[in-house]
Regions:
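Polar/acidic, low-complexity leader/linker segments enriched in S/T/G and N/D
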Residues: 1-51, 156, 166-186, 191
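Acidic/polar N-terminal loop/beta-strand segments that form early-domain functional surfaces
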Residues: 15-17, 60-64, 90
Length: 208
């Protein structure tokens, strides 16, 4: 993500999603985890449908509807190229400008509905979902409070019964930390054993 700060605005250019690449493990509504890929062309078709129906796609902060930063009718350009969904925007929001100065913008995420997908069993025991089509509702800038589900750049948010389900692709920091604890623990153990391994290697070298 490229961030260019100017006196009265910030220019941001980056990829919301790189297509055909696995996400981080995402928990579904039942707590079961899966990985996901958005297939090439899915975003392009979603953008075409939105344009045909005169529906602007919003730019939000952290998927919060009360923190709208713009839309595709004003300050946001969205396009799918050979890498994925690219977003280019100009933002004058003071909070976002401050977060940009402080290096607190982590990346992008997106919210969508009506996913058409195929599933398969992945090698690591998780399900892998291939999203072939979707209706793009919004794209979001993600700050230090969340982590994008797609590393190249979760939770499923269910609305009440009168609205459609909207899936978002970012995780709370606390949730992501829990997911990564086992790897953190391994690194901590390896680091604590390092001095002893070095001493053992020196003793073995002297004996030889």
């Amino acid at each position: 993500m490229r961030i260019e700060l100017r006196q009265d605005k910030v220019l941001i250019d980056g990829y919301v999603n790189a297509v055909a690449r696995d996400s981080r493990p995402i928990p579904d509504t039942n707590g079961e985890r899966f990985v996901e890929q958005i297939m090439p062309g899915a975003f392009a078709r979603a953008l075409e449908r939105a344009k045909a129906s005169n529906r602007a796609i919003d730019l939000l902060l952290d998927h919060e509807e009360n923190r709208k930063l713009g839309d595709t009718d004003s300050n946001v350009t969205l396009v799918e190229d050979n890498i994925g969904l690219r977003a280019i925007c100009e933002i004058t929001d003071p909070e976002v400008m401050q977060k940009a100065r402080e290096g607190k913008l982590r990346g992008w995420s997106f919210g969508f509905m009506n996913a058409r997908a195929q599933e398969e069993d992945a090698a690591n025991g998780l399900k892998r979902r291939f999203v072939e089509d979707l209706d793009l509702k919004e794209v979001s800038l993600i700050d230090e409070r969340k982590i994008p589900c797609y590393a190249g750049t979760s939770v499923n948010t269910r609305a009440d019964d009168t609205e459609e389900t909207v899936e978002t692709r970012s995780m709370e920091i606390k949730e992501a930390t829990i997911e990564d604890n086992s790897e953190i623990d391994k690194r901590a153990v390896e680091q604590s054993l390092k001095p002893y391994k070095e001493r053992l290697n020196k003793l073995q070298a002297k004996e030889n």
